[in-house]
Amino acid sequence: MDRIRIRGGRPLEGVIDISGAKNSALKVMVAGLLTDERLELENVPALADVATMAQLLAQHGIAVEETGAKQLSVGGAITNTEAPYDIVRKMRASILVLGPLLARTGEARVSLPGGCAIGTRPVDLHLKGLEAMGAEIALDGGYINARAPKGLHGATITFPFVSVGATEQLLLTATLAEGETVLVNAAREPEIGDLADCLNKMGADISGIGSDRLTIRGVKALHGARHTILPDRIEAGTYACAAAITGGGVLLRGARMFDLGALASTLGEAGVDVTEVAEGVTVSRRNGLHGTDAMTEPFPGFVTDMQAQFMTLMAVAEGASMITETIFENRFMHVPELNRMGARINVHGSSAIVRGVPGLSGAPVMATDLRASFSLVLAGLAAKGETIVNRVYHLDRGYEAVERKLAACGADIERLRD
């Protein structure tokens, strides 16, 4: 099992190219189920989760082929409507094949999903929304069995709380449902806008993109299209924290300030200079960090996928800060590992109190999930001495070429292969 070794204390200086967004690429790949024609995708990151999605789509008869650097061609006729446990368990986004399979074939059998071990993250809203559109659903032996013997129809669906996954599920499905579907209190994340843009290129009729009210008018069929995946705002935010925690300065080439949402202003409050420029976003920190509170919220609020990284930054800030997690439970699993490196963090329910320390010390640590894994890398970059991050397969699910990108900016980092 691979590990990453870091010798900390070096400011990051240089340019980091931001990859395509994992959380968009996976969903846009699923859109390939909605047509027999080919979907040509550009700026696709080379990640373990992308490979897993390609494996899942192949299970359904959809071929995913590399056509060039960061380019994929997705397409084919559906030959199988079952998504098996051994693939679905690896990645939560796998659940999104349910609606498209149902819309195209009238039936689907999909295992309940896996992914990071972050709380329960139920799929109730997915299933209730599909039922409102005419689906018949039963749970049996860890599988979702869905049928639509009379086809799917439009519906007005109001989410009781914002759900990115449920919004994506019903957005994909409604493109081929008869009539009009309205999603009220829909998630507004940039990746959802990117998915909607791709679907419209394929012939869908979606309006309200970027708002919390999406209107989808079903069409008879979708066709192939070419689409470029938007830059990964989580990767950009993560490297912004890397520049800040090392006291360096980097250009995040391709990053978009708007997509960072509340993270940009929160970093500013903490003493980090975040500036939009023609090529992307620059991030620098020449003076001290200040303890700053953060509460995770749906976009454009502070994104939950940056909570662990920002907490690491606050671990070396002057003063105290409180980080509150409102999206997922059980998302503080990185705290004991950070404390092993000298951080002073106490968890109280859904909040963590972070009391800044002058510095961290290198130590062997264990990654527990995707974003937590990079929080430990950040700690290693700032720490005195050597840090070994174990279980970096979590990291490979969502970050492309981590060692290369960091080393190019001056980090002393290498991958150890067992």
UniProtKB/Swiss-Prot annotation:
Enzyme Commission code: 2.5.1.7
Positions that bind phosphoenolpyruvate: 22-23
Residue positions of the active site: 116
Pathway connected to this protein: Cell wall biogenesis; peptidoglycan biosynthesis
Cellular localisation: Cytoplasm
Annotated positions binding UDP-N-acetyl-alpha-D-glucosamine: 92, 121-125, 305, 327
Gene Ontology annotations for the cellular component aspect, listed alphabetically: cytoplasm
Modified-residue entries (2-(S-cysteinyl)pyruvic acid O-phosphothioketal), positions: 116
Top-level lineage group: Bacteria
Keyword annotations of the record: Cell cycle, Cell division, Cell shape, Cell wall biogenesis/degradation, Cytoplasm, Peptidoglycan synthesis, Pyruvate, Transferase
Reactions listed under catalytic activity: phosphoenolpyruvate + UDP-N-acetyl-alpha-D-glucosamine = UDP-N-acetyl-3-O-(1-carboxyvinyl)-alpha-D-glucosamine + phosphate
Gene Ontology BP terms: cell division; cell wall organization; peptidoglycan biosynthetic process; regulation of cell shape; UDP-N-acetylgalactosamine biosynthetic process
InterPro entries per UniProt: Enolpyruvate_Tfrase_dom, Enolpyruvate_Tfrase_sf, MurA_subfamily, RNA3'P_cycl/enolpyr_Trfase_a/b, UDP_GlcNAc_COvinyl_MurA
GO molecular function: UDP-N-acetylglucosamine 1-carboxyvinyltransferase activity
Purpose of the protein: Cell wall formation. Adds enolpyruvyl to UDP-N-acetylglucosamine.
Entry's family note: Belongs to the EPSP synthase family. MurA subfamily.
Protein's recorded name: UDP-N-acetylglucosamine 1-carboxyvinyltransferase
Species of the source: Acidiphilium cryptum (strain JF-5)
Gene: murA
